[in-house]
């Protein structure tokens, strides 16, 4: 896995040399809004940081097509709280990744908007940290093992809008192609039943979910 970024960089350098086009380096910094698909909660409520460096290679003489490679630090996770009558919980976890996105870009004829799509490889550098607490109402996750898998392969959709000269506003969506945590067990309330003495008692069932990172990033890019 450690040779993947080097191989991608070599491909970009080869394309650049053959086309004799410029490489535009850039810095980027922004925030992520993320959730974990499969944790039984909804909403992009976990806020984290994303930032790093990258390079955009022009693949055509009119600069309409390009390819970019980035090296980023990104935070993802999930956060939600409730103290209603039926749901009593707090859920706040965050994971740190080093990621290498590779995107193909198309630029509009006026040069003000750049759209991209591609893939990203993320390496988990810090396991999810935070707190998970649930009262036994309706659903309860197994918190004995919060370990996530070390690799995250994501699909990426990207849009950049020029603000002024080399300054751009970037919106990016990413979703895991493979699970980052498998078979997370949840107990959930499944109604009532009668025990051997005829008393009505709660009935609980279990389910297991595979989990996927789902995030939206809002970034500023300064391109040289």
Give residue ranges: language-model regions.
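Residues that define the transmembrane beta-barrel architecture of outer-membrane proteins
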Residues: 21-23, 45-49, 94-98, 151-155, ...
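Residues on the lipid-exposed face of transmembrane beta-strands in outer-membrane beta-barrel proteins
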Residues: 27-31, 51-57, 71-73, 100-106, ...
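Structural signature of outer-membrane beta-barrel domains
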Residues: 32-36, 74-78, 122-126, 174-180
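Extracellular loop and loop/strand-boundary signature of outer-membrane beta-barrel proteins
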Residues: 37-42, 85-91, 140-145, 203-208
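Repeated loop/turn-to-beta-strand initiation elements of outer-membrane beta-barrel proteins
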Residues: 63-67, 111-113, 165-171
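Predominantly the C-terminal beta-signal and adjacent terminal strand-loop region
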Residues: 144-147, 152-224
């Amino acid at each position: 896995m450690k040779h993947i970024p080097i191989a991608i960089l070599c491909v970009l350098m080869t394309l650049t040399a053959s086309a004799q086009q410029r490489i535009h380096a850039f810095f980027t910094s922004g925030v992520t809004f993320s959730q974990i698909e499969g944790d039984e909660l909804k909403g992009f409520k976990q806020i984290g940081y994303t930032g790093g460096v990258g390079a955009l290679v022009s693949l055509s003489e009119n600069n309409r097509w390009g390819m970019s490679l980035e090296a980023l630090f990104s935070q993802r996770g999930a956060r939600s709280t409730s103290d209603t009558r039926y749901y009593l919980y707090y859920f706040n976890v965050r994971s740190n990744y080093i990621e290498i996105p590779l995107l193909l870009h198309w630029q509009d004829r006026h040069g003000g908007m750049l759209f991209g799509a591609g893939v990203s490889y993320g390496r988990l550098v810090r396991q999810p940290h935070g707190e998970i607490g649930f009262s036994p109402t309706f659903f309860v996750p197994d918190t004995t093992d919060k370990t996530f898998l070390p690799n995250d392969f994501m699909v990426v959709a990207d849009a950049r809008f020029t603000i002024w000269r080399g300054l751009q506003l970037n919106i990016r969506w990413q979703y895991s192609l493979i699970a980052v945590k498998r078979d997370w067990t949840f107990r959930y309330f499944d109604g009532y039943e009668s025990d051997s003495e005829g008393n009505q008692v709660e009935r609980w069932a279990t389910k297991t979910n595979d989990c996927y990172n789902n995030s939206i990033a809002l970034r500023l890019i300064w391109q040289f």
